[in-house]
Amino acid sequence: MKSKIITFVLAAIALTALPLFAQEFGHSWVRIMALALLYVLLALGLNIVVGYAGLLDLGYVAFYAVGAYMYALLASPHLFETFEWIAQLFPGGLHASFLIVVPLAAGLAAITGVLLGMPVLKLRGDYLAIVTLGFGEIIRVFLNNLEHPVNITNGPRGLDRIDAMHVGGFSLGKGIEIGGYEIPSVTLYYYMFLGLVVFSVVICHRLEVSRIGRAWMAIREDETAAKAMGINTRNMKLLAFAMGATFGGVSGTMFAAFQGFVSPESFSLMESIMIVAMVVLGGIGHLPGVILGAVLLAALPEVLRHVAGPLQHMTGGRLDAAILRQLLIASAMIGIMLLRPRGLWPSPEHGKAAPTATGN
């Protein structure tokens, strides 16, 4: 117990000091770390659906989009320019605070998750994956075309001029100065994302060891046996979709505030596949593994961006740097699955053989 406390304290100090050290090399590195934390939040949410309940969801990015567009519509002037009656109701604009938009995004995403879950309750495996994949694409196409006859999402042009996140009347879009040391906006976002990740890890851990978590895992292993044991598989599946969706909705809200711009292309099928890959490559159903997978796959493209340039130079410029980077990412993912088929950090219980009974 004492060693766990020491490890936790050291990790907290390291994660707190990391952006302060990284910003000396440029704010872009802090930005990469902040985005990596957002992907950790997304991976934790998908792990509830895929890792705990065993429901393969390839349309998880839809909940990410719901949260992002909800915040973008509330925090940008687009709605006020489109609907005059909204501008008259709120002449000063809607500048909702963190404590309002986060529960709102979580609730809206949860409702969307239940709406997705209800038609697919009897589907499993490949069929469920295909249906959820289609759902994710429907949301993206819907956002891409919802500019006629009334311009709500601004179509493929997206929504810009989105307000920074407000916490207690303070805008994270501006840096602060403490004791003569300036902490820029991107570092403040990093700390907010870190706090959300820590809170989410606690929630996921409590769910994992709770009766709900055990019910999800029973459904994952054998749904028929779970029904025989009296588990309401219908409600448990809907709860898994709703709980996982809340993480996606909150992540989308943070993404919109952080970027200041959203468009349908930010929520493509490739984004969904990357989130699934984070969960699977890290160690499906295992919180430390999921976090590791999310951090590595979120940071790897940016790190390889610096490697692809020299490699392009070595080939005499015959290969495009972007293609080289994608090739390196794909090679790394294939290598991980070949060397670690159960993930980089799999659950210790996974695949453990039951003890053999011995007679006297």
Annotate the PLM regions:
Residues 1-360:
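Transmembrane alpha-helices and adjacent helix-loop boundaries
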